[in-house]
Amino acid sequence: MKAKNVNLLFAFVAVLLFGFSCFCISRMNQTNNQLINCRNHVLEFKEIMLRLKNKSENHHQDLMQVLYQMKRKAAHTTRSSGNFLEKKGSILSQHETLPNQFEVLKYFLPHLRTAGKLYPAIATSKGRAGVSFALGISTINRGNHTYLKQTLTSVLSRMTPEEEEDSVVIVSVADTDESYLKSVVRMVKTKFRKQVQSGVLEVISIPTLFYPQTLLDKKTKTDSESWQIKQVLDFCILMLYAQPKATYYLQLEDDIVAKKMYFTKMKDFVNSLTSKNWFFIEFSVLGFIGKLFRSKDLTDFVHFFLMFYETKPIDILLDDIFLIRVCISGEPVRSCLQRKKGFRIQYRPSLFQHVGTQSSFPGREQHLKDNYY
């Protein structure tokens, strides 16, 4: 009896072991299938990532190609500008070809890509180039208010004859109103005949072709955002025109006055700088007034302004490009700003004061003053 019970016990244990073995084998097969499926998913994911990587590399190569083309274009413009700077105080003849630095606009303004050669309309110019300083003044119609004659009188009368010989003042009429252009040209030729004849004073105008159609729409002419966008484009076109003419470019506006001997002080200060690492010099703290750039750097500035011309006013973009070019990645902004004095140089006291009260934006008044003037 005892032996029988033992045999039954062994049989029961054997059945349990067999069942457990079958269960384990079944689970192992399921696990193996899961592992195979998992491996297939991993391989599939790896293949997808590889395709994405190849696509990313292709896009990266395309982007680098575009940037390379832009860099070549900028280098060509800079070399062309250098050829002009070698001709100190020279006058361009009618047979000399101007560098087509305006082609860069086609990269950023799609409506210009089918246009031919781009260049502002010349109202009056003797083609002066190879001087030390180009002073750019952008102007638009302010209705019954005008400060341009006062500005030009202040800027030109406070130059010595030698300083006039070494500079060019460019008035850019950035207004679609043809009658305003005619009134500016008439005023300039009447009140500043000597400077026009000597070549120190030029007047250009920006054809409507340069602007996107949305900015020419009547509905946007009184829109503040559109006005700011157009102002960025106006300044960029003026910078490109002035670039091959001088070693330095000074941005002014059409409603300012200059201090006595401003030109002498500006020239002496620039020549006294021992460091050549400066980014730009501020001869006024207001907006974009009195900002001095090296002409060879203008291409980089214009590229940046055109990339973001629809997002911010130009004086804010100037702050942005300063932070991008000077600040180290990951560096606290405060630490960067402490080092800015060597790159963004501020001259005191300011050499220019804002005098206009009627803004170039329709219907707006502004009473901004430079407290350091």
Curated annotation (Swiss-Prot):
**Disulphide connectivity of cysteines:** none
Which stretches are Cytoplasmic in the membrane topology? 1-5
Pfam families from the UniProt entry:
MGAT4_cons
The UniProt keyword set, sorted, is:
Differentiation, Endoplasmic reticulum, Glycoprotein, Golgi apparatus, Membrane, Signal-anchor, Spermatogenesis, Transmembrane, Transmembrane helix
What the entry lists under InterPro entries is as follows:
Glyco_transf_54
Q: What stretches pass through the bilayer?
A: 6-26
State the post-translational modifications: Isoform 2 is N-glycosylated; consisting of high-mannose and/or hybrid glycans.
**A Gene Ontology term for the protein's cellular component:** endoplasmic reticulum-Golgi intermediate compartment
Positions annotated as glycosylated? N29, N54, N144
Summed up, the tissue specificity of this protein is: Isoform 1 and isoform 2 are specifically expressed in testis. Isoform 2 is expressed in spermatocytes but not in spermatids. Isoform 1 is expressed in spermatids.
Keyword Nucleotide-binding in record? no
Q: Write out the topological domains of type Lumenal.
A: 27-373
Biological process terms from the Gene Ontology for this record are: cell differentiation; negative regulation of protein glycosylation; spermatogenesis
- PANTHER family from the UniProt entry: ALPHA-1,3-MANNOSYL-GLYCOPROTEIN 4-BETA-N-ACETYLGLUCOSAMINYLTRANSFERASE-LIKE PROTEIN MGAT4D, N-ACETYLGLUCOSAMINYLTRANSFERASE VI
The entry sums up its family as follows: Belongs to the glycosyltransferase 54 family.
Description of how the protein assembles with itself and partners:
Isoform 2 self-associates; specifically in the endoplasmic reticulum prior to its translocation to the Golgi. Isoform 1 and isoform 2 interact with MGAT1, MGAT3 and MAN2A2; isoform 2 interacts specifically with MGAT1 in the Golgi.
Q: What else is known?
A: For isoform 1 inhibition of MGAT1 activity is demonstrated in vitro upon forced membrane-association. Its rat ortholog is the most abundant protein in testis Golgi preparations.
What name appears for this protein in its UniProt entry? Alpha-1,3-mannosyl-glycoprotein 4-beta-N-acetylglucosaminyltransferase-like protein MGAT4D
| Record organism | Mus musculus (Mouse)
